[in-house]
């Protein structure tokens, strides 16, 4: 049977690998040789699970959204990652990677962030574990996610605004990689999504897989079976999606639906719909689909959501799309915002703009009344209130 998980060479089918400058070979090799041994050790698992339980507040609830279920004609459960400490799924990964960094003797943590959720989660865990923390954030994102920038500073992190390119996530990642090249010995680079060179996509997916591990147990309790008919998640780099599908990825009974950012529409050029528009390329050390021009130059992506405007996609998801294991839908800005308002009015939950893209997929799908659908609400909407309000005023 075909497996959709990573192979021993760090590939998902033809996607993945580690295409890195020579100066980083040693760092990446050290990580590749160490990560499985550490994260599979009993001592690590015990500390990781204890922090997820007592500090993050896991397991996160699996909530039957009755009014939304009625509207879409199925049994719709929401996996509430928005209820974690720091308000999103990102902290599952930062706790795991910083525990790993500590075991590797690293003293300085660097991170990139788009919406600021990964930055806040990294700064939070660095404060908890007394580590130096430097976060690179595009100047555009510093402005549109001002509160998260201030939170990171309050937590003791140094926030460096990046002024190259579009001044968003891709540019912040470039700067973080540059920093890592300059300080390979004492620095650990913590990537917030299933992107970058192997072993990052696999490591992040494994650390986030706590999401689907809990879904299995929670469905067994609520429905008497441990699998849904469909899983729905938004995808930028793809870490919440990877965590949502991890334990179901090879289970053909479970349909996988991924929602990427359509922006102002895939035909407008103002979009981040990598699966719809991307061609094979290399970005940040991985071979995957990339939005690029005829000359292979990476195009600037656009999405109203700071967490989804990435011109690549995690290799795990590129492979799922190429093998037709996942159905990938592009959800435009207005569709996402409409879906966010709908969830807020029907269930009293204000989702992050990223999660709103997953919710926006619901109206493009047809369900049977007995279908069990699990949709991951990857984060809460506090950081996006201004965007929601200003979009509404423009209408």
Q: Model regions: which residues?
A:
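Positively charged, low-complexity intrinsically disordered leader regions
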Residues: 3-16, 29-106
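Active-site nucleophile and cofactor-binding loops and adjacent substrate-binding regions
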Residues: 80-92, 109-119, 165, 208, ...
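A short, small-residue-rich loop immediately preceding and capping a beta-strand
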Residues: 85, 101-138, 226-240, 256-259, ...
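Short glycine/serine/threonine-rich phosphate/pyrophosphate-binding segments
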Residues: 87, 91-97, 111-129, 143-145, ...
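Active-site-proximal loop->helix
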Residues: 110, 118-176, 267-278, 384-393
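Glycine-rich ThDP/TPP pyrophosphate-binding loop and its adjacent helix/strand module
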Residues: 170-175, 179, 186, 195-254
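Active-site/ligand-binding loops adjacent to catalytic centers
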Residues: 173-177, 181-199, 250-253, 258-349, ...
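Claisen-condensing/thiolase-fold acyl-transfer catalytic domains that form or cleave C-C bonds
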Residues: 235, 239, 333-392
